[in-house]
Amino acid sequence: MVDVELVDIKGMSDTSLKKFMQENSISLKNEEARRIVNLIGRNPTLTEIHIFNIQWSEHSSYKSSRPILKTLPTKAPNVILGPVEDSGIVELGKINGEKYGIVVSHESHNHPSQVVPYEGAATGIGGIIRDVLCMGAKVIATADPLRFGNPFGKNKNHVKYIANEVINGIAGYSNAVGIPNLAGDVYFNESFDDNCLVNVVCLGILKEKDIIHSYAPKDAEGYDIVIVGKPTDNSGFGGAAFASLILDEEAKESNRGAVQVPDPFLKNVLIRATYEVFNEAKKQNVKLGFKDMGAGGIMCSTSELCSDGDYGAEIDLDKVHISMDIPSFMIAVSETQERFTWISPKRFTPSILKIYNEDFELSNVAEGAKASIIGKVTKSQDYLLRHKGKIVCNAPIKAITSGISYDRISKKPNRKFKEPIIKEKNDY
């Protein structure tokens, strides 16, 4: 299915537009959908609507929390890289004059873990590992602060099931990947009966000079866009939008498809293969862009890599390795796990393909897994997707990646809390 027909948002009534959104599993509000028309100057394709649905979700754009997050301190003498890429980096120290940094990333996987707890927690760990790895780091540890409902309350059986499966998911993924889970905490309270909190943290280590950035490097026009990992399927489709909604118990079954499917054994091999790409890039003195493929899938990783380097992108969805026949919008935004995107000069791309496809034989680890060239970096500021020879998306790349922001109504909390004063011991 190729999504080339324009959706007549301009001509729809508010009632018709709302119905269309519901029928197509799109969580945009009517005014947001109409905003797309103003941004791109015409009615959008279905693929373009799904792209903005992902990019304007709370999960991807932080449209409600961004104004508040901007008030937090992010700069200090020991901060090598603040919150502008996939992970932050804090100085660890210097050895023989070389500065080392600890790479830190954290996020939550709450809704997926409440709906499908094992897979939700496992893919939370998997995603946060990718965020650290793609900075060029050696991944060294994970952690998991957890919050569950009351195990002795009215929902005790379900709470215990959620808690056990979340812990099993974290353990099962971490053990197979071979990265130790070093820390975490757990609290139980009935306020979490219907929505557990599964926070995941990952740490890595690197030399400052070895940082790989989440954007296309300087003079990258014409560079290859290479994706690596599992073949794209329909798993995790709409995951970012789902993670941004208020969780509805009645809709739990229909939301299961928005939860991604983990493959930690493939991730284990992907990590080791990626370390080899790091080493080869150092030998050849090549600058690359590298980003994990999480929320928004191919669309999000490729658009952000190119946009953040002040480039555009042209992508042929027919070159994406897929495991099933799925429509254009699903190839573009599905959140299939265990995938990455590289921005590579053409002279280095054969090395990437050889390492993943021949040296580590990804296809023998997971059916259909491999590295594929799917497009190129362009000088234009457009994001262009083709499928079966037809254009399914042609929009300003900055419009796709800049997100939206709301100043939400706020009020003072009902209760005031104070941090406890803990006296330091003279001798521990």
Which stretches of residues belong to each language-model region?
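Glycine/proline-enriched, intrinsically flexible loops and inter-domain linkers
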Residues: 1-428
